Amino acid sequence: MELKALRADGWPWDDGTCAVAARGGHLEVLQWARANGCPWDEFTCTFAANDGHLEVLQWARTNGCPGDEGTCAGAAEGGNLKVLQWARANGCLWDEFTCSWAAGGGHFEVLQLLRASGCPWDEKTCSWAARGGHLEVLQWARASGCPWDEDTCMSTAFCGHLELLQWARANGCPWDVMTCARAACCGHLDVLQWARANGCPWDWRKCESIAKDRGIFDVAAWVHENKITLP
């Protein structure tokens, strides 16, 4: 085991050692690390759940590893329904991030089950679905009463999801100057152009500066040319 050799050579370890072992599903490594005094924290359970390693999660929890809402959120983000169900049945808490992480991962079935089981959500569910480009998830969330705010448009602009931004605006999602700023900083000129043509407010100086700093010169040039001609 490489970890044994590293420890024999005096290499330090910390909570992250157990977390990484859990993420990789390396139960024997995790067991050896714990038997030899390696610390752990909540991220061991979160990482195991996120990558679907139920046996690792079960061993960790049985042996006293702390867990928090991140365990359910991690399982939801990874779309690991069996892990999520086990975690809930064994006392793991959840919160709004559980729905948000499911939406961000595009896991429609998981999100539906969460809501049917009473898991709370908030505006982050919509913004994370938007960031991931998951239009169907966003549409279902809105149809089911999930709130949204300006972060939904900002997230679509940040990731360049023009079709999703168009749908959000057509359905009343608010936006602010951060929509243009995020489009500019990530080089999504088509998103920026559409947003401005449809009345999105902006700080053109900020957009131009960010684009220049990132070497996105086509965006910077367009902003400079259109700073006056567009409202």
Report each predicted region and the residues it spans.
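Ankyrin repeat (ANK) tandem alpha-helical domains that serve as protein-protein interaction scaffolds
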Residues: 1-231
